[in-house]
């Protein structure tokens, strides 16, 4: 009898513990957190830090126990003034208050980011000496003397047609003797159509049409040409070095007006060239050529042309790490590698020709620190005397004054509040501590920091870094299902590295009774090109072997983590990846919420997918398609799509739904009227919460209208 009572009480305790997660109280708490966990409850945290132009005075806003303050400080004297309003601050600084943003009514007259500029503007372009104007009229180049009637014009070309016309992107040489443009061959465009079912200003639906090139589509072709404005002579470039274009751009005249420098990105992204064309002969030669068996990561490139255009700084991953190189333009050869090592340059802040120095940010320099933490550096152009200007451990954000003498450095970690310091922009020496963030009020509200966690990846050597978010009422005696937030790109690293008072992807969801995690597996950026190019023609990988090992390692350390009960969610590329999780890794991931996913890379935008999946479109696209793999679904799946998604074609989601239905698979489909590219907005968040509570906690969620939101 005694044993039976013990057994019954144990079962009751387990049942009560399970029911405690996903309850109405949990929902109410989850929805309340964004109002409590925010920067209003963080004191001494400078925001919107700026230096006044051409001065050593910097200014910022911060919350204090007495309310919001607007502060101006002099870096030379450390003198400080505090104000109660932005108007008072700007009056003291004698700078104009920024104008309020004008309301936007609709998008009808804006160029959509997917639209290709046809380069047909008819506005005249004036020569540097102010004497002549060049413009396009009837697909041809026309010259006009400033001050004279436009009826008095000189036609420089006559062979322009609708199918092969001269571009209006005209550039004058510095000496005003030449003009450069391109002959442009347009192509037939692809369009995506979608219906706005519930427009705000009318009853009937609206059909939208959007230009949208997809992988494999034909692209425009451009050929540079240069006109001598004195003789009217035209020279046209030979296309041999740029005959398979994805893009041809970044045209710049040399300072001596003898050449035009431009960049060629080959279709398929395995060759990238910086070229130059002679104004006299039209001859094209190569300054820089990058090649890769996988892809040249062109969005990461940086080019700096020296004032006399004799030298050029170029950023490249040619040695596996993202670094800077000095090139001799005339010889087309590397003078020296400026930065080197098993770390990555992240961004160029300034190239100072006068000081012969470069200011930049980088990650991975410090071997004993999180390799994603960003620090700021100064280095000589000869690659010597590299100095860290922001040495404290953490992820840094730096603001420099006009002459780089001072840097305001704010740094933090995902689990550590920010510190803001004033340092020397010359040697990084500490000048003063501006502020140390006070999060005591945040903690009084129950705030719980995420844990930074690392585990070995699939190779058994490489550390995979991520975060673990626990609920505010965390109880280590309970068992917690795991939910992973995924966005694996590629193209960047996505796990937060700086302090965040409220993480929209993890905080509220954890409060329902979950452990929520995020990590960057192989195939993402800033750990070297070999680490990233695992994604090539293989987006279905998405780092899943590393992710599973990471979660299992966390569960091995923390017994309350249930690695046998794992869900996953994401949007956009993360929507594709979360769907892939339950199609190809359904033995590990039991439930997936997938919003606005590019579920088949053949359906998505051309630039993103051809960069990672290559060109021409081949079998790898099919192998990575969630439409093709839909019949492999295991576990629960919720598909979410905004009917007006102008980033990822909504049909991508509908085609997965169609394939799942034909395969006899059960799933949920949520269509959001009037919504663009999204994680789901308020209704989607509600559906996501309920979906995981039902499928991982195995309890019935409270009614939505009973929750205090």
What are these model-derived regions, one by one?
Residues 1-26:
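Bacterial Sec-dependent N-terminal signal peptides
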Residues 62-69, 89-90, 117-118, 132-143, ...:
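A flexible loop/linker signature enriched in serine peptidases of the S9 family
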Residues 76-109, 156-168, 181-238, 428-442, ...:
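Predominantly five- to eight-bladed beta-propeller fold
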Residues 257, 263, 395-709:
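Serine-hydrolase catalytic core recognition
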Residues 34-68, 119-126:
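Beta-strand-rich domains and repeat architectures in extracellular enzymes and scaffolds
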